[in-house]
């Protein structure tokens, strides 16, 4: 897909290696029983090494999250190592030592390769089943191999995006080429256990802009607040959620903060749309928009309440324009509202107004794959959109058998 907005090019055929100064790789290290790729590496060749990150708000944090939070206090990263096939969560002190050992192994391999690196410059990310220790013999052997396999260009980024997949059916990546001759790229994984506070989601973003860690942190937090934090597939918040942004400075260009913010936002928004489209068991993509709220915060709360409601999601799955479920859902949100003032629309067709259903509301066609639910509270200027999906038989079947 190619899109031109404000002369910037957004390309889904490219990812983390689109910006200058980055290499990546993805290999099969034997962590997954399937034999598919399960280990990815993203390497920043510099000359700058600024980095920022946001992590899960779940109080139960996986070992790699705890490790990566520590290393990011320096505001610099040379590499990110990511594995699928095991979350390394709820694994105690031994699990944290495994994360540390992984970073040490990456640092040693990169140093042997010719780039002096310390473990403090390596972030670690894991995704998969909670509760099991990682097969460290396979993982550490894979680290030694993957450093030798690093590539620039598109192939390395493609392989890395495939290696972080779990229940995903397709890799997710995108790059934005700014007309000012700098680029932002990214890859993400996630298909379930996705809720605000990020998602069961690993995401690595890269840029060749010459920007400091403070600017990166500002751009990343603004972007995630408006995108990943408003993606709610199943209301479940993972222990491993991680979004990292690395800057190589290889373009030599320092964009204005507003331009950096916009580019990172657009890349995150596109990745968010890809996550929504590939959610577990999804048959319909649903955007819930609340307008006219007393504040933007109230709008987010209301939209999220609707997006998480199982009865709303199952009605959408059945193509049932059941506006009563939407009204009931928003009615329990802890916000100000007047049911006699608010309106509800499905795909632009009004189905509820003045406290009652509208004529023809039950005939609105929801058979298509994209559904827009809009609730106007008519109280103020607050507005927010939350992405979600329907709740299908496929979702239940996939998650009931996940650990086996």
Curated annotation (Swiss-Prot):
SUPFAM superfamilies: DmpA/ArgJ-like. GO terms for cellular component: cytoplasm. The record marks 127-128 as: Involved in the stabilization of negative charge on the oxyanion by the formation of the oxyanion hole. One of its GO terms (biological process) is ornithine biosynthetic process. The active site is at 200 (nucleophile). Substrate binds at residues 166, 189, 200, 280, 399, 404. Coiled coil: none annotated. Transmembrane segments: none annotated. It catalyses: N(2)-acetyl-L-ornithine + L-glutamate = N-acetyl-L-glutamate + L-ornithine; L-glutamate + acetyl-CoA = N-acetyl-L-glutamate + CoA + H(+). GO terms for molecular function: glutamate N-acetyltransferase activity; L-glutamate N-acetyltransferase activity. Keywords: Acyltransferase, Amino-acid biosynthesis, Arginine biosynthesis, Autocatalytic cleavage, Cytoplasm, Multifunctional enzyme, Transferase. Pathway: Amino-acid biosynthesis; L-arginine biosynthesis; L-ornithine and N-acetyl-L-glutamate from L-glutamate and N(2)-acetyl-L-ornithine (cyclic): step 1/1; Amino-acid biosynthesis; L-arginine biosynthesis; N(2)-acetyl-L-ornithine from L-glutamate: step 1/4. Its main location: cytoplasm. The record marks 199-200 as: Cleavage. It is found in: Cytoplasm. Its EC number is 2.3.1.35, 2.3.1.1. It comes from the Bacteria. Catalyzes two activities which are involved in the cyclic version of arginine biosynthesis: the synthesis of N-acetylglutamate from glutamate and acetyl-CoA as the acetyl donor, and of ornithine by transacetylation between N(2)-acetylornithine and glutamate. Heterotetramer of two alpha and two beta chains. Belongs to the ArgJ family. This is Arginine biosynthesis bifunctional protein ArgJ. The lineage of its organism: Bacteria, Bacillati, Actinomycetota, Actinomycetes, Mycobacteriales. The gene is argJ.
């Amino acid at each position: 897909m190619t899109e031109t907005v404000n002369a910037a090019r957004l390309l889904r055929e490219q990812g983390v290696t689109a910006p200058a100064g980055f290499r990546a790789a993805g290999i099969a290290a034997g962590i997954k029983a399937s034999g598919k790729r399960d280990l990815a590496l993203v390497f920043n060749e510099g000359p700058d090494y600024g980095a920022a990150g946001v992590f899960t708000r779940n109080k139960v944090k996986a070992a790699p999250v705890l490790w990566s939070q520590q290393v990011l206090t320096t505001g610099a990263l040379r590499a990110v190592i990511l594995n699928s096939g095991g979350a390394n969560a709820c694994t105690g002190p031994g699990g944290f030592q495994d994360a540390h050992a992984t970073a040490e192994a990456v640092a040693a391999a990169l140093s042997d390769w010719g780039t002096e690196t310390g473990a403090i410059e390596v972030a670690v990310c894991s995704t998969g089943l909670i509760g099991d220790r990682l097969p460290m013999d396979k993982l550490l052997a894979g680290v030694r191999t993957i450093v030798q396999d690093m590539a620039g260009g598109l192939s390395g980024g493609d392989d890395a995006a495939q290696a972080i997949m779990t229940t995903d059916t397709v890799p997710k990546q995108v790059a934005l080429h700014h007309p000012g001759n700098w680029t932002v790229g990214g890859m993400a994984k996630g298909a379930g256990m996705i809720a605000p506070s990020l998602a069961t989601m690993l995401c690595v973003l890269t840029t060749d802009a010459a920007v400091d860690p403070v600017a990166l942190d500002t751009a990343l937090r603004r972007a995630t607040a408006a995108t990943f934090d408003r993606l709610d597939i199943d209301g479940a918040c993972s222990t491993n959620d991680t979004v990292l942004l690395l800057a190589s400075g290889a373009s030599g260009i320092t964009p204005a903060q507003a331009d950096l913010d916009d580019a990172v936002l657009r890349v995150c928004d596109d990745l968010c749309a890809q996550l929504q489209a590939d959610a577990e068991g999804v048959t319909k993509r649903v955007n819930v928009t609340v307008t006219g709220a007393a504040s933007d915060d109230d709008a987010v709360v209301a939209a999220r309440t609707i997006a998480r409601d199982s009865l709303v999601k199952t009605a959408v799955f059945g193509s049932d324009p059941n506006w009563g479920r939407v009204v009931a859902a928003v009615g329990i949100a802890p916000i100000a509202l007047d049911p006699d003032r608010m309106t509800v629309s499905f795909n632009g067709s009004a189905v509820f107004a003045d406290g009652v259903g509208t004529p023809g509301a039950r005939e609105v066609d929801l058979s298509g794959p994209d559904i827009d639910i809009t609730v106007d509270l008519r109280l103020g200027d607050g507005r927010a959109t939350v992405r979600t999906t329907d709740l299908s038989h496929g979702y239940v079947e996939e998650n009931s058998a996940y650990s086996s």
